[in-house]
């Protein structure tokens, strides 16, 4: 059989409408008859990125005040009983603590990225603290 040369033909417009399979048609008609609608889900990572942007913009404290205050009092009990704290002292401790933790997590994230990972692990925190000189 001899080969024939194919010539280009002009398109007649858009795609022809395709017939739906029976399963697709059944699926589309189900929610209309009172089926339960699934809640909307974002793709993995979308919400995380949104939260990152939100918390980078904000300046408010992220740890709740009363649980942090209880923790401070519990730790202080080991050193001296019946210590009293000014509210400004607890606020200063909380501000310093959150600032330290945010910086540590930034360094931890850099350690994870350096290891070609996107998930932080305890070994990343240990490496970040060791590089900082906080722990040998």
From Swiss-Prot:
Acetylation is generally linked to gene activation. Can be acetylated to form H3K9ac, H3K14ac, H3K18ac and H3K23ac. H3K9ac could compete with H3K9me and prevent gene silencing. H3K9ac is restricted to euchromatin. The modification N6-acetyllysine is found at residues 10, 15, 19, 24. It is found in: Nucleus, Nucleolus; Chromosome. The keyword Nucleus applies. Expressed in bicellular pollen, root tips, shoot apices, young leaves and ovules. Transmembrane segments: none annotated. GO terms for molecular function: DNA binding; protein heterodimerization activity; structural constituent of chromatin. Keywords: Acetylation, Chromosome, DNA-binding, Methylation, Nucleosome core, Nucleus, Phosphoprotein. The modification Phosphoserine is found at residues 11, 29. One of its GO terms (cellular component) is nucleosome. The modification Phosphothreonine is found at residue 12. Core component of nucleosome. Nucleosomes wrap and compact DNA into chromatin, limiting DNA accessibility to the cellular machineries which require DNA as a template. Histones thereby play a central role in transcription regulation, DNA repair, DNA replication and chromosomal stability. DNA accessibility is regulated via a complex set of post-translational modifications of histones, also called histone code, and nucleosome remodeling. Belongs to the histone H3 family. The nucleosome is a histone octamer containing two molecules each of H2A, H2B, H3 and H4 assembled in one H3-H4 heterotetramer and two H2A-H2B heterodimers. The octamer wraps approximately 147 bp of DNA. This is Histone H3.2. The gene is YAH3.
